[in-house]
Regions:
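Extreme N-terminal starter segment of soluble prokaryotic enzymes
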Residues: 1-3
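A short, glycine/small-residue-rich beta-strand->loop->alpha-helix junction that serves as a flexible
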Residues: 5-15
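Donor-binding and catalytic core of enzymes assembling or modifying cell-surface/extracellular glycoconjugates
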Residues: 10, 163-250, 256
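Short amphipathic alpha-helix
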Residues: 15-23
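A short, Lys/Arg-enriched amphipathic alpha-helix followed by its capping loop at the start of a domain
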Residues: 22-28, 168
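A short beta-strand-loop structural module common to alpha/beta enzyme folds
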Residues: 29-41
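Secretory-pathway luminal glycosyltransferase catalytic domains
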Residues: 40-164, 168-169
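Active-site regions of enzymes building and remodeling cell-envelope glycoconjugates
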Residues: 48-57, 189-198, 252-264
Length: 264
């Protein structure tokens, strides 16, 4: 029996769903379940997987919910560690963030966006010879605890990344996506640039979809940002990510990046 916990925002949820899907294949579609951690998805608006993608999520059986409660109690008491340790192949409860490229190798096969009835910028992005997404994440990353652990990417990082892109693709046009677009407009002086602002309110995954339409990507230290590039329909002709993924020096960057991506 394997139980994969769904938690965090959409970026993390995608890693976790891919882990679940891989385990299903490994175990011949038997004995693998999802647990929806409402407490740890609530602050991100809940579970977004089936709203953003053509996914049918399974119902969580009551016995799985009870099993998770029991396993979490054992974890608090430090008992039967093999049942929940992240590095133990015998673990039943998989409650890490599953961020490794081995778990997402088949992501393109299982993750297809739900169509949007109407969405600004689609034609503008797809008509460009070389559209580049630039994702600036601030928002919750500015909270003291998150800033200490994650940090925010510097203006220098974005400007340097833009120079790197233009050296290879002089015709690049940059499309800036951000949860703080006013800050981006005031601080990012990028050439040939469009700041993405929707005429009507759109869910966050609208930006994820638009980012995936681009041929190049400059991402933030964010799993949401990562997926915008990884699911790129332009096959990511160039993708740049921050070498320092975390502000906390003892945390290592996750092994999720394709070899041809550039660390800066």
């Amino acid at each position: 029996m394997k139980i994969v916990c769904i938690k965090g925002g959409l970026g993390n949820q995608l890693f976790e769903y891919c882990r679940y899907h891989g385990l299903l294949r490994q175990h011949n579609n038997h004995g693998v379940y999802l647990h929806y951690d409402r407490r740890r998805t609530k602050q991100h608006g809940g579970v977004w997987l089936d709203k953003a993608f053509l996914i049918t999520l399974p119902t969580e059986p009551w016995r799985v919910k009870l099993m998770v409660m029991a396993l979490k109690m054992l974890r608090k008491l430090h008992l039967f560690k093999r049942l929940y340790r992240e590095d133990d192949p015998r673990a039943v409860l998989i409650d890490d963030y599953s961020q490794h490229k081995q778990f997402i190798a088949n992501a393109a096969e299982i993750l297809n966006f739900r169509p949007f009835a109407q969405l600004d910028y689609v034609d503008e992005i797809t008509s460009e010879p070389f559209a580049v997404s630039v994702h600036v994440r601030r928002g919750d990353y500015l909270l003291p605890v998150n800033k200490a652990n994650f940090g925010v990417c510097s203006v220098h990082y974005y400007l340097s990344a833009a120079v790197t892109v233009r050296e290879r693709h002089p015709d690049a046009r940059f499309f800036v996506f951000s949860d703080d677009i006013e800050w981006a407009k005031m601080n990012l002086n990028l050439p040939n640039c469009v700041f993405v602002e929707h005429a009507q309110p759109q869910p966050d995954h609208a930006d994820l979809y638009l980012m995936s339409l681009c041929k190049g990507h400059i991402i933030a230290n964010s799993t949401f940002s990562f997926w915008g590039a990884y699911l790129s329909m332009g096959s990511s002709a160039i993708a740049i990510y921050p070498k320092q993924w975390f502000a906390e020096p003892t945390w290592n960057a996750p092994d999720i990046f394709p070899r041809h991506w550039i660390a800066l």
